[in-house]
Amino acid sequence: MSIFKKTIFSVLATLLIIGNVYAAGDKIRIGTEGAYPPWNSKDASGKLIGFEVELAWSLCRYMERQGEIVEQDWDGMIPALLMRKFDAIMAGMSITAERQKTITFSQGYADEVAQLAVMKGSSLEGMDTPSGINLSIGGSDVNKALKTLTGALAGKTVCVQTATIHQNFLDSGDVGSVNVRTYKTQDEVNLDLTSGRCDAALAAAVAFTDYAEKSGKSVVLVGPTFSGGAFGNGVGVGIRQAGDDAIGQRDAKLLADFNKAIDKARKNGDISRIAIKWFGFDASM
């Protein structure tokens, strides 16, 4: 094959890729898990619902773009984004330095604090810790809380969803050698917690309060709320890192468009309103 033909073939291949990725025109495909209530879940009919689903439609309206919500298992979320199964992630994904090595994020649109959950009557109830600690700040209160947790969780089994910031924290050793049991979904974590297969579970606090309210189970939040450090700096829209080619430029524009839309949604009170509807409080950033 001549150099000229190779060049033409390369150009056509690039155009074909762009065509495949953006054939839907103005449509933005947004990936979500559909299994992390109240952030995102499904109703009895299988329809995707939740805070982020409703917010996604709001942001698309501000961008004057059509939207499509794509369901994706959590542990394959970032790989699917990189493979261009969809254009953005809205799935309760916290903005962390580790994830920013692979993808980029919009500005945060919601706060998410993590907390341990146990069944009522557990020996872990009543731990003497601060109400909340920020691992990015550190200090004596943080060190004291981690020491208390290390002692309380020694020999205990803590259940957690796989490939999450919560698993990363437990695996870090900050709370000692905990027996970590991982699950594919948060629903599986909740079920094993209430069935007694876990001494405790770690996730976003609202994931447990939502489950307890809907199931009637006696789930109790214990210990401090966690933020910062391994837990990140709020939840944002995950987008591919922009390259220098035409596709990369489209990703860069999409990031800018999401940031502008989040600004508008925040200013007009949309994020606060939707958060209060789904969380029962204003989690907007």
Predicted regions: what they are:
Residues V53, E68-P79, N143-A145, V180-S195, ...:
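Short helix-initiation/N-cap motifs at beta->coil->alpha
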Residues I18-A23:
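Sec/Tat signal peptide C-region and signal peptidase I cleavage site
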Residues G34, D111-Q115, E213-N259, A261-M285:
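Periplasmic-binding protein-like
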Residues C60-E71, A152-T157, S172-E188, R197:
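A local structural motif
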Residues A24-M93, K101, N268:
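Extracytoplasmic small-molecule ligand-binding "clamshell" domains
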Residues D75-P79, G92-T102, N168-G173, D187, ...:
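A ligand-binding cleft/hinge motif common to bilobed small-molecule-binding domains
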Residues R65, S94, F105-C159, A163, ...:
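A conserved helix-loop-strand patch within extracytoplasmic ligand-binding domains
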